[in-house]
């Protein structure tokens, strides 16, 4: 059996929205919503809150999960998801890592379970949560999913264009470490079998000012 570990990354510092991860939403710290959803899901062997700040450890304890103290040098604005996920995987025993962003407070335990199941059942190396955008989309001012020489299509007839939701990401430890060593980056999967998992409705709401 593969060991599946959940990680919720939550820096205390943020330049655009200071202490956003512990700001209250309906009288509850923002980060607590996804922690509770992760606990309610029944797919994880361990759940960690990953932060540089001990201030968040009390929230982890309250939710009955583990706290991982991120090194200070990985808590700056210059550090990326690639960096702190690698640090976590190098120090925590896991076969599969599922990352849940605290800035997605409406993610549900049911979606988390389905996401983790999809990752394992399909033997993905990387699984990315996405939104389907069923609207006319452009890239470099050129149409992606419609013909500009034809009449305006009905939205329901358009081929959906996928964009990152970021709320949920998953990687196998082996593929993540291998990609990082080869490319100095691993967040997007690089090599290996990559899948997408579509989120809908409020689960795609993201309160990020940064992805950490």
Regions found by a protein language model. Give the residues of each.
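Hydrophobic helical membrane-anchoring modules
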Residues: 189-191, 195-212
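N-terminal nucleotide-binding beta1-loop-alpha1 segment
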Residues: 1-18
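Active-site acidic Asp-centered loop
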Residues: 100-102
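Conserved core of the sugar-phosphate nucleotidyltransferase
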Residues: 84, 105-188, 197-198
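Short phosphate-binding loop-to-helix
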Residues: 48, 54-98, 107-114
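Short, high-confidence coil segments that cap the C-terminus of an alpha-helix
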Residues: 44, 94, 123-124
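A short, N-terminal amphipathic alpha-helix
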Residues: 30-47
């Amino acid at each position: 059996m593969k060991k599946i570990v959940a990680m919720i990354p939550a820096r205390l510092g943020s330049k655009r929205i200071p202490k956003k991860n512990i700001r209250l939403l309906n009288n509850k710290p923002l980060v607590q919503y996804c922690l509770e959803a992760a606990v309610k899901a029944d797919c994880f062997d361990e759940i960690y809150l990953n932060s540089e700040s001990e201030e968040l450890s009390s929230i982890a304890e309250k939710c009955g999960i583990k706290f991982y103290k991120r090194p200070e040098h990985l808590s700056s604005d210059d550090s990326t998801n690639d960096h702190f996920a690698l640090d976590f995987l190098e120090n925590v025993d896991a076969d599969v890592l599922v990352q849940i962003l605290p800035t997605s407070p409406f993610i549900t335990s049911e979606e988390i379970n389905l996401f983790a199941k999809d990752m394992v059942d399909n033997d993905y190396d990387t699984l990315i949560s996405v939104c389907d955008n069923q609207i006319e989309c452009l890239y470099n001012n050129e149409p992606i999913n419609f013909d500009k020489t034809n009449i305006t299509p009905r939205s329901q007839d358009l081929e959906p264009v996928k964009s990152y939701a970021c709320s949920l990401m998953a990687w196998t430890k082996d593929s993540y470490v291998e990609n990082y060593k080869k490319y100095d980056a691993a967040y997007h999967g690089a090599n290996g079998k990559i899948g997408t998992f579509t989120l809908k409705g409020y689960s795609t709401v993201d309160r990020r000012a940064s992805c950490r």
